[in-house]
């Protein structure tokens, strides 16, 4: 019982430092839980959002083969393979059959539904193209389409079915052909009767595979689809193909199951080809779902270059703060430890007391922190999966770290001899150990940074072609921060002594006394100084990584998409251009984009109106803007162009050089002159050529070649997403609109950047907790000094100012040094981290180091205000104590 009372008394006497321990544990548990759980949940949500955003063929995979003479056996064979190779938990598939366009019999009467005389000449000849129909058998169509009028074919009466083939026609085809319910259509060997009209619920849905015919009802001279029961496809005079279309179950996708799916897709085609009864006529795999999943998982792999950084930063700051607080606590108890040891206290007893203190204050703080972290995620990021196991593990780890570090500091102090030599009291052994540790960390940082710069990122390629996080390179940013902070900390005593000598020559107690205290009590101030340096350095590094990634991602997305909105795949480009021009607040520019040959290289030519390019494609990199000016100012005797760096290297062509552009065997060759070299040409990918479209037309005409037509549209818009939505609804000319957001990595990387900010802010919070503990320890250990100074005539207010000056000088110096350390670490690693986070960026595009200023200034400003408040409270306590009457032994 006496032992327990003594332990409680010891804890109460150092309650300020133990409160700091509890605060650090709370920060570690809360911020650590938020980082890990948010990163895990965001990875799943980001993957699902990315795959769900894929439209048409990009969100599905399809296997096609000619319909066999035994379709039932073929269907069973296909189902057996797909059920075996595709996991039902994450993928679903449907079978359908579609005919090639079927010609309508020439004798069809207009009263039967189709007016064949609309294009007839007076002499009876017909100058209109022949109308063809596409027949579709799809048992699951009712799940993704709606009836406009009538019934589905399988609901038609038996009498109707015996005479004609009942069909439901796409409403767009019905409008174009003038069809209504009850009309009949004569084919070569059968008659169709319209029993219903339908429209897709969402023509962009992956299950429709992006077919223009489904979107509009007509494409490439064919109308439809005309939905029929599958037996109606027997004996058609055209080819009929069977399709198995697979789409992912979005809510079941995880990063691991998504990676497994790509392997499942690769195995399915060979398994189908080898399956008896499937047929042998042209099995093919179509669709972009594997590429979509690969792009999404590549983005998640890229995020792995950043996700360890906030945890490492938080852990380093937390461990440093707890270690320094343990040292501070052991140093403050040095006298009582010597006394207890002299009276027979065992080392394990002293260690057990301090470990128990750490557990007693740390466990409630860890539970509270983990709960706060989970609650914050539920409020700020609802709908994401959460894991209580993560919260429990982080809370337990935080308490364990606190217990181990405080127990280690107590063990180190208790193991010191009771009777100590001058060398023991001087701390030379401790300083030597600290110097050795600093050297070891510096060596580790140098090796890690070398590995990091060698690979260009923390990610490395594995033998199977995937990516993995290099365990040494990923430590580089934090090890650089630690090494520089430890080096700065090792130098601060010498700087403090120098400043003390300078200040001692000046009259007055301030600033001589504060600087002398900093020099003489350097180990005690090290707890707050080191964690403050690390926290400030971490926030500067975070701002550099965040700003550099944002700029690099924006540049890469602009180069990938070109315009703010890019319209591609139009079967009728004129209709797409007309629809785009009718939208409000848009600038539309047609773009020629085609493959050409430049010397030995295959390149992509992008030709558009350069005078409008800044309007349709704002935010392009500066070198592209400069290239536009160079092209416009160049001599027009030869076609002026800009080429990218890779093409320049491959052809040994630079500004002013003459090159030949081979447009194709039918379009001839034109001569051009290089006006500028850019890192990458917008919309071209690698090996790009940029030219003005009007000048290209003039050069082609002069060469006697065929003028190239525009392949796509670039649109500048006040609201790009509204333009994309309009194209999704109308699908003019079968076109697909893509915004820059589709090429951005923000949906996957932004949560990791948020986690990085959380880690840096957590490091600052740990530093603030260490400062509060330092202020409390100084207040309890230097009461006698306050009385002595008062007896010597030092006013209470001056003593308060001296204490404020001590803390302000220590923390202010740490902030300045931390900012410098963060700048050095950012210079060494931020650009590589930004590149690693944008895996699809052109290799020639160099990331620039840019600071995200507003969060940086807000975080540093809040930290400076908080530290100033702590210093003011500590100074106020000294002022009150120095001005209180009475003797110390009475108080």
Where are these regions (language model features)?
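Membrane transport/envelope proteins' first extracytoplasmic loop
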Residues: 1-318, 328, 456-474, 487, ...
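Alpha-helical transmembrane segments
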Residues: 312-319, 384-405, 469-486
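Juxtamembrane segments of multi-pass membrane proteins
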Residues: 456-646
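C-terminal membrane-exit region of the final transmembrane helix in multipass inner-membrane proteins
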Residues: 369, 377, 381-382, 392-434, ...
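Hydrophobic alpha-helical transmembrane segments that constitute the membrane-spanning cores
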Residues: 313, 357-381, 762-772, 809-830, ...
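Alpha-helical transmembrane segments of multi-pass membrane proteins
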Residues: 16, 348, 352-365, 369, ...
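Interfacial "coupling" helices/loops that link adjacent transmembrane helices in transporter permeases
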Residues: 14, 320-359, 422-424, 769-812
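N-terminal Sec/SRP start-transfer signal
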Residues: 1-32, 423-441, 490-538, 783, ...
């Amino acid at each position: 019982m006496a032992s327990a009372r003594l332990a409680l008394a010891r804890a109460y006497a150092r309650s300020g430092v133990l409160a700091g321990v509890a605060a650090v544990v709370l920060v570690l548990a809360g911020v650590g839980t938020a980082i890990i759980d948010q990163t895990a949940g965001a990875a799943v949500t980001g993957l699902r959002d990315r795959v769900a955003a894929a439209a048409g063929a990009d969100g599905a995979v399809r296997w096609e083969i000619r319909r066999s003479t035994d379709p039932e056996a073929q269907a069973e064979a296909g189902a057996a393979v797909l059920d075996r190779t595709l996991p039902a938990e994450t993928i679903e598939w449907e079978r359908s059959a579609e005919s090639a366009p079927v010609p309508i019999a020439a004798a069809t009467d207009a009263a039967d539904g189709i007016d064949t005389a609309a294009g007839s000449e007076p002499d009876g000849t017909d100058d209109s193209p022949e109308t063809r129909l596409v027949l579709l058998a799809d048992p699951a169509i009712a799940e993704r389409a709606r009836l406009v009028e009538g019934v589905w074919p399988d609901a038609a009466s038996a009498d109707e079915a015996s005479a004609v083939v009942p069909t439901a026609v796409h409403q767009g085809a019905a409008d174009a052909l003038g069809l209504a319910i009850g009309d009949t259509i004569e084919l070569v060997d059968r008659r169709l009767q319209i029993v219903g009209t339908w429209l897709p619920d969402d023509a962009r849905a992956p299950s429709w595979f992006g077919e223009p015919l489904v979107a509009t009802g007509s494409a490439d001279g064919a109308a439809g689809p005309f939905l029929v029961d599958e037996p109606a496809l027997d004996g058609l005079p055209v080819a009929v193909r069977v399709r198995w279309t697979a789409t992912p179950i979005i809510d079941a996708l995880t990063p691991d199951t998504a990676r497994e799916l790509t392997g499942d897709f690769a195995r399915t085609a060979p398994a189908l080809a080898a399956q008896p009864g499937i047929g042998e006529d042209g099995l093919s795999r179509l669709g972009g779902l594997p590429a979509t999943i690969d792009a999404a998982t590549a983005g998640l792999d890229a995020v792995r270059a950043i996700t360890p950084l906030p945890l490492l930063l938080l852990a380093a700051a937390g461990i440093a703060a707890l270690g320094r607080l343990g040292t501070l606590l052991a140093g403050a108890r040095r006298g009582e430890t010597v006394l207890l040891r002299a009276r027979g206290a065992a080392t394990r007893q002293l260690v057990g007391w301090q470990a128990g203190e750490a557990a007693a204050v740390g466990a409630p703080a860890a539970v509270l922190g983990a709960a706060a972290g989970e609650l914050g995620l539920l409020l700020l990021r609802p709908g994401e999966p959460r894991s209580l196991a993560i919260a429990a593990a982080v809370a337990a780890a935080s308490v364990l770290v606190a217990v181990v570090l405080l127990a280690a500091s107590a063990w180190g102090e208790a193991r010191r001899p009771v009777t100590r030599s001058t060398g023991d009291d001087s701390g030379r052994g401790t300083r030597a150990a600290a110097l050795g540790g600093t050297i070891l960390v510096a060596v580790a940082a140098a090796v890690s940074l070398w590995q990091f710069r060698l690979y260009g990122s923390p990610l490395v390629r594995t033998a199977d072609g995937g990516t993995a996080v290099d365990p040494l390179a990923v430590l580089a940013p934090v090890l650089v921060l630690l090494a520089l902070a430890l080096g700065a900390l090792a130098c601060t005593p010498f700087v403090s002594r120098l400043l003390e000598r300078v200040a001692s020559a000046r009259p007055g107690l301030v600033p001589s006394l504060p600087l002398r205290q900093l020099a003489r009590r350097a180990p005690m101030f090290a707890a707050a100084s080191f964690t403050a340096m690390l926290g400030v350095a971490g926030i500067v590094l975070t701002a550099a990584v965040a700003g550099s990634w944002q700029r690099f991602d924006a540049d890469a997305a602009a180069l990938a998409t070109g315009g703010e909105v890019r319209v591609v795949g139009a079967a009728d480009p004129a209709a797409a251009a007309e629809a785009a021009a009718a939208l409000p607040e848009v600038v539309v520019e047609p773009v020629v984009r085609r493959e050409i040959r430049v010397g030995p290289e295959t390149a992509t030519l992008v030709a558009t109106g350069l005078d409008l390019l800044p309007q349709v494609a704002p935010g392009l990199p500066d070198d592209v803007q400069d290239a536009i000016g160079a092209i416009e100012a160049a001599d027009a005797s030869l076609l002026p162009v800009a080429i990218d760096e890779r093409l320049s290297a491959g052809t040994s062509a630079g500004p002013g050089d003459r090159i030949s552009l081979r447009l194709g065997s039918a379009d001839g060759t034109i001569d051009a002159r290089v006006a500028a070299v850019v890192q990458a040409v917008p919309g071209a990918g690698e090996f790009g050529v940029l030219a003005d479209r009007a000048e290209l037309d003039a050069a082609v005409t002069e060469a006697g070649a065929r003028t190239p037509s525009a392949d796509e549209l670039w649109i500048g818009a006040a609201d790009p997403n509204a333009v994309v939505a309009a194209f999704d609804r109308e699908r003019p000319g079968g076109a697909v609109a893509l915004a820059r957001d589709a090429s951005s990595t923000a949906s996957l990387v932004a949560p990791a950047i948020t986690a990085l900010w959380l880690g840096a802010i957590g490091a600052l919070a740990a530093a603030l907790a260490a400062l509060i503990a330092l202020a409390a320890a100084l207040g309890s250990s230097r009461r006698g000094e306050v009385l002595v100074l008062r007896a010597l005539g030092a006013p209470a207010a001056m003593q308060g100012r001296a204490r404020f000056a001590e803390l302000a000088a220590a923390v202010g110096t740490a902030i300045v040094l931390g900012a410098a350390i963060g700048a050095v670490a950012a210079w060494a690693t931020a650009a590589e981290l930004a590149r690693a986070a944008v895996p699809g960026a052109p290799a020639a595009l160099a990331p620039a180091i840019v600071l995200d200023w507003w969060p940086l200034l807000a975080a540093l400003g809040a930290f400076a205000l908080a530290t100033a408040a702590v210093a003011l409270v500590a100074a106020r306590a000294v002022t009150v104590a120095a001005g209180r009457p009475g003797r110390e032994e009475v108080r």
